[in-house]
Amino acid sequence: MNLSNHFLVAMPDMEDAFFSQSVVYICKHDEDGALGIAINKPSPITMDMIFSATGKNIPMRMQHDSVMMGGPVQVDRGYVVHTPIGNWQSSIGVSDNIALTSSRDVIENISREGAVDKALISIGYSSWGKGQLERELADNAWLTVPADEHILFDIPYEHRYAAAFAKLGIDPLALHGKAGHA
């Protein structure tokens, strides 16, 4: 099972302080573990803080975007999920069109026409060790659904959890994570 380019959708009864009602975009998943970015948890960092550090102006299309809290790991670093993939110093290709980049050059060029079409900026990331995510899935902590660029980039962050459930065709109020296994 490879969940790269999928959303993890937290079950409604998840009690973890950070991951409760989270949607996590999985950027890398292999036998060694998984790495993702929470796409619906705003951070206290502003776009102005991010772009002023590079001496660049915030692109008009991102003026009202929030910087996400991507996860509890390396919260002192920035990460950008973006299209198109491009040629950046430190990127992971997630799909044919989406990459996760952690190098400053993507931020410095994000306002340049055509360099980046769509972007979600976060601080920190989410990580699971070898077999950890698979155990959490077996324990009914998460639902999975193929990622959707519209949810990832276009829907306001506060509506992404509901949108992910809608993509699953499930009413979150009808779920309970303590189901048994046959």
From Swiss-Prot:
InterPro entries: AlgH-like (IPR003774). Gene3D superfamilies: VC0467-like (3.40.1740.10). It comes from the Bacteria. Coiled coil: none annotated. One of its GO terms (cellular component) is cytosol. HAMAP family: UPF0301. Belongs to the UPF0301 (AlgH) family. This is UPF0301 protein NMCC_1249.
